[in-house]
């Protein structure tokens, strides 16, 4: 179930802004990660050091240093939204801010913990933390236009952290950054052609914004190539398939569940996600050894079954039944989700050298 804008909030003394409690954690909300810092510090970058140094030089230029500056278009823009659009847009801001802030925390901690042992890697993470903090702050400032803001300090201490081995961090964050690029640029291009659907001026910033996401994805691409065991062999192929499926399925189920936001922009959530998935899958073939067969009708048929199961789970949550009864009612839907994910995972993947031969 996606996060909602209706959570507890507390007023900030002497301010018109209310501090909003974080949305309840679910399988669809952004995760906070930690990893093995010693293993990261010990990584040998020499197999692809030249490319990593070139990417770090790009980070140093900080192309968007002066991009995230609010202008007069924000004045009164929040008051122009009807209540339903306002609600779904605040949900979008909250989820996006949380996601960007989780990236900041991970990258910042990595840069701090490996600085002395792996300075090039630490510097890259420091630059990416700068970008993510800038994004999160800009989103949180937009929330204040609606009289709300996230307490990012409280978020840091209250969220549970998921431990991932470094290679799993690489898979997950690479996909997150590349998906972020395609999500932002797709919305920007659509609103360029349909300016009447631009419900808030923050979307004017998405063209440059998405380039940060793209550069971050390129960094993880280069880092995996410096650690070739992450993208070679049977285990790597299986893990790449797993992360592709997990990330695509989560995004699709979440976006269809909150399709009203995309409708407010004049987009169809399903069509939007299909484009983002297709483009990300294509990008992923540049580094992953296999990609998913997203053109196979079975793929989206399976995702639709997950959507239906998620809707059924949300319906159970909305009832007044006692917790044990809810648990029993949810059980068959959880089992069905697990079986469907297994079926999708077992679909034959496409070898990247066959899917995208021009880049191998």
UniProtKB/Swiss-Prot annotation:
Pathway(s) where this gene product acts: Porphyrin-containing compound metabolism; chlorophyll biosynthesis (light-independent)
Keywords for the protein's UniProt record, in alphabetical order: Chlorophyll biosynthesis, Iron, Metal-binding, NADP, Oxidoreductase, Photosynthesis
Region: Disordered, residue numbers: 1-21
UniProt-listed GO biological process terms: light-independent chlorophyll biosynthetic process; photosynthesis
Catalytic activity, reaction form: Mg-protoporphyrin IX 13-monomethyl ester + 3 NADPH + 3 O2 + 2 H(+) = 3,8-divinyl protochlorophyllide a + 3 NADP(+) + 5 H2O
Cofactor annotation: Fe cation
Enzyme class: oxidoreductase
Function noted in UniProt: Catalyzes the formation of the isocyclic ring in chlorophyll biosynthesis. Mediates the cyclase reaction, which results in the formation of divinylprotochlorophyllide (Pchlide) characteristic of all chlorophylls from magnesium-protoporphyrin IX 13-monomethyl ester (MgPMME).
InterPro entries: AcsF, Ferritin-like_SF, Rr_diiron-bd_dom
Pfam families, A to Z: Rubrerythrin
EC numbers for this chain: 1.14.13.81
Protein family: Belongs to the AcsF family.
Organism: Synechococcus sp. (strain CC9311)
Name the record gives this protein: Magnesium-protoporphyrin IX monomethyl ester [oxidative] cyclase
Gene Ontology terms for molecular function: iron ion binding; magnesium-protoporphyrin IX monomethyl ester (oxidative) cyclase activity
